[in-house]
Amino acid sequence: MSKRRIAPLTFLRRLLLRILAALAVFWGGGIALFSVVPVPFSAVMAERQISAWLGGEFGYVAHSDWVSMADISPWMGLAVIAAEDQKFPEHWGFDVPAIEKALAHNERNESRIRGASTLSQQTAKNLFLWDGRSWVRKGLEAGLTLGIETVWSKKRILTVYLNIAEFGDGIFGVEAAAQRYFHKPASRLSVSEAALLAAVLPNPLRYKANAPSGYVRSRQAWIMRQMRQLGGESFMTRNQLN
């Protein structure tokens, strides 16, 4: 009887290990491939596309127009760093002090959860994973972040991030956002336009770059101040990000 009870557990354990091994190979291959090849599609794009189809929106198309860092305004990279991850050039994927502050805040304010994800973590999540806050997903995100930080340069991480970030419903990547909201290529974005796009990133389905609320305008102004404090364009050059 004991053998019959153990056998199914053993089978499930082996199956789980094989699935994890297959995912590790898949994700590892993706990290290696996308270190040099433009990203055609991300997990977030796939999730949005499937949700649209299930909702009967068959005309919905989630895609991004890939552009190199040379074709992105330096203000855009600086804006997302100022808004999301000011220690981006320094850390290895995780901002430990920011994580500790977020945990302390969340313990005191359970109704208003604060995140502390770096640009590297957001890139790993957007590229390979699904939305959610489970410990399983967080664990996978941590592993993928370490992989990306090990294989990719900081400039590559920032390039991929800007090309797959969601800036509105169905608007992925800075080139699509620049064309949609400002009718110009990403290379010509101004300081204020870059800051406005960065201002909607915490929740691009709620905050609108084409109809900014008072909060978004306030956040845009704060981001512009942070960009100046970081040193402007010299920050990007100094850290070899442009």
Curated annotation (Swiss-Prot):
It holds the Pfam family Transgly. Keywords: Cell inner membrane, Cell membrane, Cell shape, Cell wall biogenesis/degradation, Glycosyltransferase, Membrane, Peptidoglycan synthesis, Transferase, Transmembrane, Transmembrane helix. The chain crosses the membrane at residues 19-39. PANTHER family: BIOSYNTHETIC PEPTIDOGLYCAN TRANSGLYCOSYLASE, MONOFUNCTIONAL BIOSYNTHETIC PEPTIDOGLYCAN TRANSGLYCOSYLASE. Its main location: membrane. It is a single-pass membrane protein. It comes from Salmonella typhi. It is found in: Cell inner membrane. This is Biosynthetic peptidoglycan transglycosylase. GO terms for cellular component: peptidoglycan-based cell wall; plasma membrane. The keyword Membrane applies. Its EC number is 2.4.99.28.
